[in-house]
């Protein structure tokens, strides 16, 4: 049997509103609706012990409200390109990138193009193409199943065999593509985390 615990009040769209004011307004509306729903449920004689929600893009807003007593942020652990596009204000936490895809240049067909061995099977693109990490001379342009095409600046020094790091556009479905996460600190592999839920449907 099930025991009623509370209300799920997650606002998914607000996680990706770019401006702080947009997120603040959206979550203020969520808090008002959550309070109204709690009052209605408790008026009917059912205790609401928990109001849960929030995400990486708005966790400080729900967490500092007097309405939510549980938050569900998850992407902040790894971060991705899409969340990094959110503008922050002084109250927001500065989460760092911790998820990278290592790929290498397999082909250099022209001065302005290169092909890497990381495509759709390596990175989810539902929230945009990966970001080439810490490089201003390369832009990940498009992906096929096995490969990605880079657009290079005329002075790019990248050549065959060079390795680069990518930040996925969306961390959640990207992690689901792998069996393991290789955990590196500096030049040392400190752990290998199995992704036990990969492919799990239930």
Summary of predicted features, one role per range:
Residues 29-32, 36, 46, 96-100, ...:
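Conserved active-site and cofactor/substrate-binding residues in soluble primary-metabolism enzymes
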């Amino acid at each position: 049997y099930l025991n009623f615990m509370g209300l799920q009040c997650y606002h998914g769209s607000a996680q990706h509103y770019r401006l702080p004011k947009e997120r603040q307004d959206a979550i203020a509306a969520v808090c008002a609706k959550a309070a109204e729903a709690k009052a209605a449920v408790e008026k009917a004689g059912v205790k609401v012990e928990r109001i849960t929600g929030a995400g990486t893009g708005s966790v400080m807003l729900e967490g500092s409200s007097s309405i939510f007593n549980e938050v569900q942020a998850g992407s902040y652990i790894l971060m991705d390109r899409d969340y990094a596009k959110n503008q922050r204000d002084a109250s927001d936490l500065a989460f760092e990138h911790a998820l990278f895809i290592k790929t290498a240049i397999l082909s250099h067909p022209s001065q302005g193009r290169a092909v890497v061995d990381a495509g759709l099977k390596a990175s989810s693109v539902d929230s945009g193409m990966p970001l080439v990490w810490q490089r201003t001379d390369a832009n990940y342009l498009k992906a096929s199943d096995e490969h990605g095409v880079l657009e290079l600046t005329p002075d790019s020094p990248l050549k065959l065999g060079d390795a680069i790091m990518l930040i996925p556009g969306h961390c959640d479905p990207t992690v689901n593509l792998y069996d393991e996460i290789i955990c590196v600190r500096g030049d040392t592999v400190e752990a290998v985390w199995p992704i036990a839920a990969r492919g799990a449907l239930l």
